[in-house]
Curated annotation (Swiss-Prot):
GO terms for molecular function: histone deacetylase binding; transcription corepressor activity. Transcriptional repressor. It is found in: Nucleus. It comes from Homo sapiens. Residues 121-134 have a biased composition (Polar residues). This is Mesoderm induction early response protein 3. The modification Phosphoserine is found at S52, S53, S114, S156, S165, S168.
C-alpha cells in the first residue's frame, strides 16, 4: 500500500511512495506544550457536555447515501461519467477504484501545523481532499476549502437546512410592521365602574376658542374692557396701551356672544359678577418707594415689601416689577441711577477719573436729601466745583507736563552720582481725597545690596528733592520708566512747592530714570500756597498710587 506524503513545494501535496522523517520545530513544540491545569479545565468542561446529540448525528450520517453525505459536507456530486460507470459496478469494484487515502501520522501532523490557515481546517473531512492527487480529481473535483470560500459554503449549508425543514428564506425574513394595516383596532370600553368609583356625568364647557377672531381684534377688545372697568389707571401708569393682560371672564363673555365684540363689551360691563382680577393702581409714592427699595435691596421683594412698600403684598411687588421693567419709567430710572450696571467695572488699564471724582465729591458734600432719593436723581454739584472741572483744557495739561522738572538726562546713567542726605527721621505727610487709582504697580529690578525703588506704602510722603544719589555704579539701568503728573490748575501749581509732595525712600539707594510726579486733588478751588499744609493734614489717606509704566 502506497503512503501519501506532501511535497516541500506544494501546499496541497501529492501521493508518493517515499517516507519522510518528521522533525518538529521549536514553534511546534511551543504550541504543543500544555499546562496540567489547562488539561484539567478542559476535562471538566468535557464532562459537562452532552454527547448524545453528536452520537445521534453520527448514526444518522451512517445511514445516509454517499451523494447526500458529500452534499451535506459541501462537496459537489460526482460527474455523470463516473456516476454511470459506478452505477453498473458493484460496491467492491468501486472500492478498488478509489485511491488509497490512508495517511501517516507524521504527514497529518505536518498538515495541521503548517500554518494558521490550515489550523482552522483540522477536521478529517477537510484533510481528505487535501491529500488527493490528480487521479482523485475525477471523483472529488472540488479542492480543499479555503477561508474565502468558507462563508459561501456556510450560506449554502444554511439554505440546504432551510429547504430540508420546509421553510423558504422569504418566510424566515423579518419584516418591519409599519402602516395602517398593522394598527390595532381598540374596541370601546365595556367595563363597569367599581362600587367606590363615581360616574362622571358632568358636561365639559368651552370657555374660549382662539381660532375664530383675529388676534388684533381680541387685543382691542381686551383693551376696551380694561378701560371700561377702571383699569385705565394702571395702563396710564405703565406704558399705556402697549401691554394687555388676558381676562378670562371677558373672553368667555365674547364666546357666549358668538364673538360679537360690541355685545360682549356691554354684557361684560353690565354684569355685576365681572372679574376685577387686575391689580389696583399704584400711587406715585408707592412707585418711588419701590424704586428706592430696589436700589437698596436689589430684587429681594420680601425686604422691599417689609421696609418700603408695606401697603402691597410680595406677590403684588413681583407682578409690578415685571410690568414696570417693560415701561418707560424703567428706562428713565435706569438712565438716572445706572440700575443693573456695576460701577467702575472698566478694563483694568482704564480708569474713569472724572466719574469717580464727581461721585466722591458728592460723598464729601454731605448726606443726600430724602427728596433726591425718592426721585432717584443725584444731588447737583456745587457751581464752584463745576467751574473748576470745566476749566481744565488741553493747554492746562501741556503746561502741567512742561512744568514738571526733569531729574536728569535719560541717556546719562551716571547722572545722579551726587551725595544725598538720609531722610530716615523725616515725618510722613498723608494726603486725603486724592482720587487716583492704581493701574500698575511698577517693580524695578534690583542689583547687589540696594533695593531699587521699593515703596513701603502707597501714598505721598515728604521729601527734599535736592541733588541725591539714586543710582549706584553697580546697579543696572532699569528697562521701565516711572511717569507721574500733577492734575491741578496752573495757578495752584505755580504756588505749591514740590518739597511738600515728595517720596520717602527710607535711606535706600534707588535707581530711577526721568521721574515725573502726578497728584489729583478734588477740593482745590480756594487753596493757596499758605493753605497747602492744612489741606494735606486735614484729610485721610486714600490707599492708591498713581504709577504709570512705559
Amino acid at each position: 500500500m502506497a503512503e501519501a506524503s506532501f511535497g516541500s513545494s506544494s501546499p496541497v501535496g501529492s501521493l508518493s511512495s517515499e517516507d519522510h522523517d518528521f522533525d518538529p520545530t521549536a514553534e511546534m513544540l511551543v504550541h504543543d506544550y500544555d499546562d496540567e491545569r489547562t488539561l484539567e479545565e478542559e476535562e471538566m468542561m468535557d464532562e459537562g457536555k452532552n454527547f448524545s446529540s453528536e452520537i445521534e448525528d453520527l448514526e444518522k450520517e451512517g445511514t445516509m447515501p454517499l451523494e447526500d453525505l458529500l452534499a451535506f459536507y459541501g462537496y459537489e456530486p460526482t460527474i455523470p461519467a463516473v456516476a454511470n460507470s459506478s452505477a453498473n459496478s458493484s460496491p467492491s469494484e468501486l472500492a478498488d477504484e478509489l485511491p488509497d487515502m490512508t495517511l501517516d501520522k507524521e504527514e497529518i501532523a505536518k498538515d495541521l501545523l503548517s500554518g494558521d490557515d490550515e489550523e482552522t481546517q483540522s477536521s478529517a473531512d477537510d484533510l481528505t481532499p487535501s491529500v488527493t492527487s490528480h487521479e482523485t480529481s475525477d471523483f472529488f473535483p472540488r479542492p480543499l476549502r479555503s477561508n474565502t470560500a468558507c462563508d459561501g459554503d456556510k450560506e449554502s449549508e444554511v439554505e440546504d437546512v432551510e429547504t430540508d425543514s420546509g421553510n423558504s428564506p422569504e418566510d424566515l425574513r423579518k419584516e418591519i410592521m409599519i402602516g395602517l394595516q398593522y394598527q390595532a383596532e381598540i374596541p370601546p370600553y365595556l367595563g363597569e365602574y367599581d362600587g367606590n368609583e363615581k360616574v362622571y356625568e358632568n358636561e365639559d364647557q368651552l370657555l374660549w376658542c382662539p381660532d375664530v377672531v383675529l388676534e388684533s381684534k381680541v387685543k382691542e377688545y381686551l383693551v376696551e374692557t380694561s378701560l371700561r372697568t377702571g383699569s385705565e389707571k394702571i395702563m396710564d401708569r405703565i406704558s399705556a396701551g402697549t401691554h394687555t393682560r388676558d381676562n378670562e371672564q371677558a373672553l368667555y363673555e365674547l364666546l357666549k356672544c358668538n364673538h360679537n365684540i360690541k355685545e360682549a363689551i356691554e354684557r361684560y360691563c353690565c354684569n355685576g359678577k365681572a372679574s376685577q382680577e387686575g391689580m389696583t393702581a399704584w400711587t406715585e409714592e408707592e412707585c418711588r418707594s419701590f424704586e428706592h427699595a430696589l436700589m437698596l435691596f436689589g430684587k429681594d421683594f420680601h425686604l422691599i415689601q417689609k421696609n418700603k412698600v408695606r401697603t402691597r403684598t410680595v406677590a403684588e411687588c413681583v407682578a409690578f416689577y415685571y410690568m414696570w421693567k417693560k415701561s418707560e419709567r424703567y428706562d428713565y430710572f435706569a438712565q438716572q441711577t445706572r440700575f443693573g450696571k456695576k460701577r467702575y467695572n472698566h478694563h483694568p488699564g482704564v480708569t474713569d477719573y472724572m466719574d469717580r471724582l464727581v461721585d466722591e465729591t458728592e460723598a464729601l458734600g454731605g448726606t443726600v436729601n430724602a427728596s433726591a432719593l425718592t426721585s432717584n436723581r443725584p444731588e447737583p454739584i456745587p457751581d464752584q466745583q463745576l467751574n473748576i472741572l470745566n476749566s481744565f483744557t488741553a493747554s492746562d495739561l501741556t503746561a502741567l507736563t512742561n512744568s514738571v522738572a526733569t531729574v536728569c538726562d535719560p541717556t546719562d546713567v551716571n547722572c545722579l552720582d551726587d551725595s544725598f542726605p538720609p531722610l530716615g527721621n523725616t515725618p510722613r505727610g498723608q494726603v486725603n481725597h486724592v482720587p487716583v487709582v492704581t493701574e500698575e504697580l511698577l517693580t524695578l529690578p534690583s542689583n547687589g545690596e540696594s533695593d531699587c525703588f521699593n515703596l513701603f506704602e502707597t501714598g505721598f510722603y515728604h521729601s527734599e528733592l535736592n541733588p541725591m544719589n539714586m543710582c549706584s555704579e553697580e546697579s543696572e539701568r532699569p528697562a521701565k520708566r516711572l511717569k507721574m503728573g500733577i492734575a491741578v490748575p496752573e495757578s495752584f501749581m505755580n504756588e505749591v512747592s514740590v518739597n511738600n509732595l515728595g517720596v520717602d525712600f527710607e535711606n535706600h539707594t534707588h535707581h530711577i530714570t526721568s521721574a515725573k510726579m502726578a497728584v489729583s486733588v478734588a477740593d482745590f478751588g480756594s487753596l493757596s500756597a499758605n493753605e497747602t499744609n492744612g489741606f494735606i493734614s486735614a484729610h485721610a489717606l486714600h490707599q492708591h498710587a498713581a504709577l504709570h509704566s512705559e
